Amino acid sequence: MKILQVVSSFPPAYSYGGAVKVSYEVSKELAKRGHDVTVFTTDTLNSQSRINEPATRMEGIDVYRFRNLSNNLAAKNLAVAPEMALTLRKIVKEFDVVHIHEYRSFQTIAACRYAKMYNIPYILQPHGSLPRIIEKQGLKKIFDVVWGNGLLEHASKIIAVSGNEIEQF
């Protein structure tokens, strides 16, 4: 099966939290099981540095890093990689399924839109980012109304990390 993983940051950018580690571990395991795994991510390493390797293969996973507009924004969970969106539009139809890590991101909107356009099933894994109870509540509510509710509605599956997260859906 050809699987595309979409995540804002990927190893060695471990400072960006759980989605980095989970997407990496899931990708490694899928590759070990014989699946063709590709990861689309940004070039963010941390708030000051970028990973200057646009394409690489690690542990059976093809990793493509797209330039994000600002590492400072990425450090605030606002990574934006326009070239990734353009590439998704062109090639998402080559995949059997898309696994999207994170919920409120530019990459998520693009991946969901193009997967839906080409009738490619997508799995959405918010990694605990669904609740609006923490900072930026107003912005999160706007995102949810404009994009988020549709992203959830059209997902083939949604992965929750806890019983509490299940209740948020």
What function would you assign to each model-found segment?
Residues 97-131:
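An aromatic- and histidine-rich active-site surface loop
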Residues 1-52, 59-62, 93, 153:
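N-terminal subdomain of nucleotide-sugar transferases
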Residues 90-96:
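Glycine-rich phosphate-binding loop signature in dinucleotide/nucleotide-binding domains
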Residues 58-89, 135-140:
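A short, charged, and often flexible helix/loop element on the N-terminal side
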Residues 153-169:
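A short, active-site helix/loop in glycosyltransferases that binds the activated sugar's phosphate group
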Residues 121-123, 131-154:
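Nucleotide-sugar donor phosphate/pyrophosphate-binding loop at the beta->alpha transition
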Residues 96-97, 157:
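Structural motif
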Residues 6, 40-42, 66, 125, ...:
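Generic beta-sheet signal
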